[in-house]
């Protein structure tokens, strides 16, 4: 399935080095201020979802950690609000990519997709439960050293 993906990215993770700055230009990225989420960002996310676009939200609030952290309720909020599924995705091995690239070597990055977790309007009442379910699904797909 070829469909564009919009990624949520923290403003403080916006790369400053020229060789990292190309990614947001080629991929759909919505920058978000972690300290104070702007209404315009929320509206933009709602708009993407209503257009049936794919939105990627890292439930931990970061994509830079090599260990699984506690999930935040952002992805659960949008899934419950729009009654759309959450597709848990486990990504590991990324920490080896840049050092390997510097040595002109290949490395493996593993991406595993889990079964959809169907969110309903009832989940709005208990977002943390939906978040726990999502994080547990991700945890089950990761090797132990990443948990």
PLM feature spans:
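Non-catalytic C-terminal accessory region of glycerolipid acyltransferases
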Residues: 40-147
